[in-house]
């Protein structure tokens, strides 16, 4: 999803992928800790 900051990615990553962490890079969420 499009993001402004990394905090917008945490919930998205948890729900969609089960990953526990995420970062906003180039306005796109990248998920980590899968």
From Swiss-Prot:
GO molecular function ontology, one term from the record: ion channel inhibitor activity
GO CC terms in record: extracellular region
InterPro entries assigned: Scorpion_toxin-like_sf, Scorpion_toxinS_K_inh
Subcellular location: Secreted
SUPFAM superfamilies hit by this protein: Scorpion toxin-like
Miscellaneous note of the record: Protein described in PubMed:18502464 elutes at 21.73 minutes, whereas protein described in PubMed:23684923 elutes at 21.22 minutes.
PROSITE patterns: SCORP_SHORT_TOXIN
Record's keyword annotation contains Secreted: yes
Functional summary from the UniProt entry: This toxin reversibly blocks Shaker B potassium-channels (expressed in insect Sf9 cells) with a Kd of 96.6 nM, and presents an even better affinity toward hKv1.3 (KCNA3), blocking it with a Kd of 17.7 nM.
Listed name of the protein: Potassium channel toxin alpha-KTx 6.17
Protein family according to the UniProt entry: Belongs to the short scorpion toxin superfamily. Potassium channel inhibitor family. Alpha-KTx 06 subfamily.
S-S bonds: 3-24, 9-29, 13-31, 19-34
Pfam family, one: Toxin_2
Domain remark text: Has the structural arrangement of an alpha-helix connected to antiparallel beta-sheets by disulfide bonds (CS-alpha/beta).
Key words of the record: Disulfide bond, Ion channel impairing toxin, Potassium channel impairing toxin, Secreted, Toxin
Subcellular location, principal: secreted
Tissue specificity: Expressed by the venom gland.
Gene3D superfamilies, per the entry: Knottin, scorpion toxin-like (3.30.30.10)
Organism: Opisthacanthus cayaporum (South American scorpion)
């Amino acid at each position: 999803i499009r993001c402004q900051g990394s905090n917008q990615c945490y919930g998205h990553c948890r729900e969609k992928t089960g990953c526990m962490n995420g970062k906003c890079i180039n306005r796109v969420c990248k998920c980590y800790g899968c």
